Amino acid sequence: MGLKYLVWMCTRAEEYEYAFSLGGGKPLSEELTSEEAKKLFNAAADFGVENLFITGGEPLLRKDLLELIEYASAFGLKLYVKTKGWRINEEVARKLASSNCKVIVSVAGLEKVDDTLRGEGAFKRSINAASLCSKQGILYSLSVMNTKYVVNQVRDLVGLALKLGSEGFSLECLIPRPVHIEEQRVKLVPLEPTPEEREKELNELYLLSKQLGGRIRITPYDMQYNRVLKTKEPWLTLRGRCEIRNNLEADEWLEVLDDGKVYCCSPLGLAFGDVRRNPLDDVMERVRSSDLVRKLADRINIKGKCRICEFNGICGGCRARAYVYTGDMFASDPACPYRPATFTV
């Protein structure tokens, strides 16, 4: 018993609407209340959750967030909050540190890109927050949303994370959540890097991880990175990055959205319960017994080049990205430029 990762999107509220906002950046009227959030933390502790990630929207727009984090810390959960950081000052950073809560500060790129996508002054506010968190020893990661605008900024962004004293750097994928999907497609598709640009980024991050020799944890959240690793270092034994598949082997990952629904893969819309009504162990049992989850986890069911790819076992392509951009969750990952030797159109 025990879940490695529980992610709670506590609100979709934002200071204002921008490129990555959900539902116009307005909070949902039925988001979990303070008491319901505390019940979720109780349930998480009972279920043996190791890592609790709190995301948004902008989590710090919840007036009860610091109180909730302090409450959760009493259970010994490893806590992380992902934020733009605009509402972090010295006092907030100290309070987060006192609750042993690590902070992931998100930016959309270097200053010009970040200010273009998130508003003038956005970058400086986020970097100031990162510096304050670093001084408290709680800067877990500098997180960057992967768009076509950061393709040539990866090296400088990793360097910035190092300069800030961050434990890590992560590159996130632009994959819509299961709300306002059509609206998100309109906003996000034009921002996507091409498959070739994505390949360039992943190879650059591999080189940086070797050059920096463990000075910083570099995490590209992309299924294809396993293929890059295996190509560079064939002797490596790698585990697949698909949480759908991993949930069948162990209690790996669940995501709770602001309305309380629980997903094993939110972009696919695979909800298996509601924290207001369903215990987490019941939710996980539903995940494991789902015919669709088992079908998705069995890579023999994937279509196109992903099915015959020699890296199928450690990659298999992102099922969510296939679904969002092709309408078929079993289709080949449209973001991958790799062509298996046996593939013919």
Regions found by a protein language model. Name each.
Residues 57, 108, 174, 314, ...:
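Flexible loop residues that form catalytic
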Residues 2, 17, 48-49, 99-100, ...:
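Short loop/turn motifs at secondary-structure junctions
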Residues 99, 106, 112-259, 263-278:
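Radical SAM enzyme [4Fe-4S]-AdoMet core and its adjacent flexible, acidic
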Residues 32, 63, 121, 149-152, ...:
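Residue-level signal for the nucleotide or nucleotide-sugar donor/cofactor binding architecture
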Residues 7, 53, 80, 104, ...:
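A structural signal for isolated positions on well-ordered beta-strands in alpha/beta enzyme cores
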Residues 1-99:
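Conserved alpha-helical substructure of the radical SAM core
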Residues 222-343:
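Accessory C-terminal segments flanking Radical SAM cores
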